[in-house]
């Protein structure tokens, strides 16, 4: 079907006579119908990828690309005087995720569909997502982020289940979003909602009655957990998700002929982080309800469930108080106790018990009763095996494996950077769109001046696009000829946005002293801080204060500017990543499981400035030392220092004059004049007296390496070679490769 026919059928108009809104909804209808007409992935055995988050981003352009009609639609629009970019702006971004965990899940379902595998994503249909971030007086404020409209991507199904909590029962409803594979088949994102959800209990902020479960259950992703009511609500949410998922799994297996004793032949469950962990006892409970005895039910579930660990941070491995579960899901506690008793009967190491110190350890349950445990980057998996989960690795060495994360090149190159995609196709053909390893062929052009010039021109165009977009959206005045130095990711101390901010202060002082950079520098930040994460919000406050001070200083702003984008999301990422020159991946070594932003930037020709952490290690191995800028202490040094417990941040502060000057500036009159003294002093004291993620030991190395990167940028031809090497080596990080490995080594769907 053509767009002209679609708008004629819907509005009885020509494209020229339609508004952009009308064209958008006609395109939405057309693509939904085309997706429904595609053959769904099928097979006896099915994967259920259960995740609390799916950060899918806007769907229109990605679906048009995967359906193979993007260029045709773009041409039709242009012939009628319309701009596809303006049409895309109308779409609201689904508020179904937050950070890398959710974006990974979204990339994975895209690859599952593209590879023709029989698998669905399963999660919750959040109405307001995490929150919409707004800046007010240099502070983060949180407001609801609605996205659901009557005419949208969600399709209401007839599937509904009663879900029993302690003292009351709620009714669920399943909504589907079709996930379109690239020139292939489709799969589904299956999102459960509560029938009694009530958006009216939310006002202009994200505050609401956390105890009214029947109205609030699916309103927000990760409700504020700074109080017990918020933490308890998370338990209700997680059980609601897995209870519905478990029933769906059993119903679909039975419909295909399973007697449930053979469930492992019909279903495999990937537990994405610890949020869906209760699916293990819930499946055991439901199998017992259907007549299977406890012993066999446990054996069946242990052959069905697999667990992905996404973190090295102990606080992120969920542990719920027993009394939470006894209140919210009392029917699960006898099963969880039985699972724990069986562990105790065969294992003497108390640190591996499921129930310990009045807490239920979700990851422990996943490891004992899952058939696979995987990390998400080589370094991460090695740290799990040798350190963080070593006690479990000794018990089950055969369960542990690595699956380095990946990204979908459809969204993160073809959709967000069509100019670079076209250049690549002109050089090596379009086989790379299906087999990302073909990007290696670009290595043949590293000494071709015409190719390097074109690559620089593509980058310059994307930088101009970002400048214009951010000027339109947020009023930023950006020098498109400056170095675009970008750090965009969830705000967390281990990701060390605070170290980047300290460098900005250091550079500010250098410029004030007359040491001006050869090329102007624009430092971009984008990050949301969890509402209850006070220090993270203080870091945002500092960055916004620096933005105000530096950008309004006529002595400094011609050489250095700072911009923090508001409400960073997938849509903004798709604008920023293609424009980036230097990708900041500066987490404390040993703390970032993998990262996927590093891969997206690399694919779009940015050079990584990073620690040897997460997937940075594999990027460095692929591109070589000349094509990445690494700094900082190695992971083992960091792990050893934590083990000794002898880190003293103040000692670094007192012996490093550059560091001392930068840290002191946080509480200077200059910053306090545009900021809040309480927030700034709290951050200052946190760094000076704690600095838990060791910003100070890496600071000198960071300055030195960042200056090397800026110096290297001046040789444009040599820089372009480094860009091309990075793009040519990015094929390994395709989520198609990751999912193929999951399937061959864990799921075994076909």
Where are these regions (language model features)?
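A conserved ligand/cofactor-binding region detector
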Residues: 1-750
